[in-house]
Amino acid sequence: MAKQRPATLSVYLYIPNIVGYMRVLLNCIAFSVCFSNKTLFSLLYFFSFCCDAVDGWCARKFNQVSTFGAVLDMVTDRVSTACLLVILSQIYRPSLVFLSLLALDIASHWLQMYSTFLSGKTSHKDVKDSTSWLFRLYYGNRMFMGYCCVSCEVLYIILLLIATNQTENLMNVVVKSLMQISPLSLLLALSIFGWSIKQIINVIQMKTAADVCVLYDIEKQHKKP
């Protein structure tokens, strides 16, 4: 008699993955009103971002960690940030600043994921063998990583909210906002600091991942007869 396969819950219906679908839906609604209602957009976008921590907690709590869930999580994060950066590039000048940030974000994370598969690691956050102390600190300390990630999103949301014209000079708006002594200026300063660290991490991540790819090519050539 053939051995019956155990009944298992479809990976697509894992609780953390359902949370991921909700994040996608929230982002779709948010970006549909990003120009007509910036306050609603900010609330929906930030709530979706906060749910990023919820799906990770659910995955560990219910033992529903999956490769699909990890990919869905990263793709949702990258696409959400990319869309917001594109919007900011239409509001602020020079727009190349935000397009460059978009390129760095996508390139660094894509290379990191690809190098993870090449090295046989199970997670792109496994950087114990990295020579960069800042890189190890970032992925080894959840609080520090959370601060940097939240800072990026908060900074981008603030920039969207304080823009009053269709085209703004980025430096003028940032300097003017920082000069005003207020809770907003303090939040902006804290966000800029965390954002700066995150961009440094992205550069280190891209270089480290590129080194892994190059090393893989060298080792493959040496194995050839």
UniProtKB/Swiss-Prot annotation:
GO cellular component, one term: endoplasmic reticulum
Alphabetized UniProt keyword annotations: Lipid biosynthesis, Lipid metabolism, Magnesium, Manganese, Membrane, Metal-binding, Phospholipid biosynthesis, Phospholipid metabolism, Transferase, Transmembrane, Transmembrane helix
Binding-site residues, a CDP-1,2-diacyl-sn-glycerol: G56, R60, S66
UniProt-annotated catalytic positions: D77 (proton acceptor)
Any single biological process term in GO: phospholipid biosynthetic process
Residues that bind Mg(2+) 2: D52, D73, D77
Binding site for Mg(2+) 1: D52, D55, D73
Domain of life per record: Eukaryota
Membrane-crossing residue ranges in chain numbering: 6-26, 29-49, 84-104, 143-163, 184-204
Family: Belongs to the CDP-alcohol phosphatidyltransferase class-I family.
Protein function: Catalyzes the biosynthesis of phosphatidylinositol (PtdIns) as well as PtdIns:inositol exchange reaction. May thus act to reduce an excessive cellular PtdIns content. The exchange activity is due to the reverse reaction of PtdIns synthase and is dependent on CMP, which is tightly bound to the enzyme.
Name this protein carries in UniProt: Probable CDP-diacylglycerol--inositol 3-phosphatidyltransferase 2
Species in which this protein is naturally found: Arabidopsis thaliana (Mouse-ear cress)
